Amino acid sequence: GPLVRPEGEAATFCADYQCPRQIRGRIQHFASRGAMDIEGFGEQRVDLFVTEGLVGDVADVFSLDYDRIAAMEGFGETSVANLRAAVDAARTRSLGRLLFALRIPHVGSTVADLLAAAFGNLDSLRVAEMVDIEAVPGIGPVIAASLRDWLDDERNGALLSRLRVAGVDP
């Protein structure tokens, strides 16, 4: 896809949401230690699971086909059991960790924790008006607009609904 660089920002990125590198990057970040902290879900496994069609977005992490994984080369009974346990443990991570894990532009771990403390749950945040978001100390108009845009995107709304169905509901 086309590379873009938002005005005033240093980094370029692929604007295609379905770009394989974008998909892998979102899943790797989601599973990383600072985010949902899913042990055994590193870069190589993400590459393998995306290539094999086991995951296409972060919600798919919670509906893995463990029987299919067990049949794959390099996966024994113990590694599959450990992976399942790590994924199950991630269902109960805090709202701050989830918000950071979702890679919402301008929402780093500190901002994610501020939002979680202010709104308490995902439902309250999803319906929050711009003025409510901006009223949180440490959250300015750029962050508020970025968050509101992300929440208003239908793909992200569907993703949040799928995460809830999968038991991720901090």
What positions do the PLM features span?
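Accessory alpha-helical DNA-binding modules that contact the DNA backbone or grooves
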Residues: G1-P170
